[in-house]
Regions:
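Short, glycine-/Ser/Thr-/acidic-enriched flexible segments
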Residues: 46-49, 77, 116-118, 176-177, ...
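Short coil/turn connectors at secondary-structure junctions
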Residues: 2-3, 36-38, 105-107, 160, ...
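An anion/pyrophosphate-binding glycine-rich loop and adjacent beta-alpha core
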Residues: 4-155
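A conserved FAD-binding loop/helix module that cradles the flavin
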Residues: 1, 205-206
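A glycine-rich dinucleotide-binding beta-alpha-beta segment and adjacent secondary-structure elements
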Residues: 145-203
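Residues forming anionic-ligand binding surfaces in small-molecule and nucleic-acid pockets
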Residues: 1, 112, 200
Length: 206
């Protein structure tokens, strides 16, 4: 007789994954949640723009600011893009289910770093006393973003074949860890006397 298992129904959902991009891809690729510190999540406001992007008749950079729906910032102004992962995941799926998804499968939203690049670039120009021309702002802003997320951007570009410094990333939620584990008491002992489960092996500590 084995040890009892608990909480098999609890599953983490990770909102920041590279979506499926073709028939050859067997699973979604996990990206770091840290990207939401600086990236702004959006989909087109107009259905015709979403369709045009899916059909590759439009690029995301061609969608003007006023035609972008930063839906997390709109729905949760106090938290914006830093809402809890379950909220971000549900909101992304809702937008995609409503027909606003932006990749070929309709299961992706944009994670855009243009605002962060501009903000960091202006800060760096001010710090170093440099004229904040558009080119200088972008160059210095991209350096800061590269220092923070360069390895993730490199991984994304290798998989998707698009430069995330210039074009918004595409992301979509994916199932992550199963939260269940071996049942333990307050002393971390399982239902097998003398057998203990410590850390993520037990049901309560993941």
């Amino acid at each position: 007789k084995g040890a009892y298992f608990a909480n098999p129904c609890f599953t983490q959902i990770h909102p920041t994954c590279i979506p499926r991009s073709g028939d050859y891809q067997s699973k979604l690729t996990l990206m770091s949640e840290s990207l939401r510190n600086d990236g702004r999540i959006w989909v087109p406001k107009k259905m015709e723009d979403a369709v045009a992007i899916r059909e590759k008749r439009k690029r995301p950079t061609e969608i003007p600011e006023e035609d972008r729906d930063y839906y997390l910032e709109r729905r949760y102004p106090a938290f914006g893009n830093l809402v809890p992962r379950d909220v971000a995941s549900r909101a992304a799926k809702e937008r995609c289910d409503a027909g606003y998804g932006v990749n070929e499968t309709g299961e992706a939203v944009y994670l855009d770093f243009a605002s962060a690049i501009e903000r960091y670039g202006k800060e760096q120009c001010k710090i170093h006393g440099v004229e904040p021309t558009k080119e200088e702002v972008i160059k210095r802003g991209e350096k800061i973003v590269e220092a923070k997320y360069g390895n993730l951007f490199q991984m994304y570009e290798k998989i998707v074949a698009e430069n995330p410094y210039k074009t918004p990333m595409m992301i979509y939620p994916a199932t992550h860890y199963t939260m269940g584990g071996i049942w333990v008491d307050y002393n971390l002992m399982t239902t097998i006397p003398g057998c203990y489960a410590i850390g993520e092996a037990n049901f309560s500590d993941h």
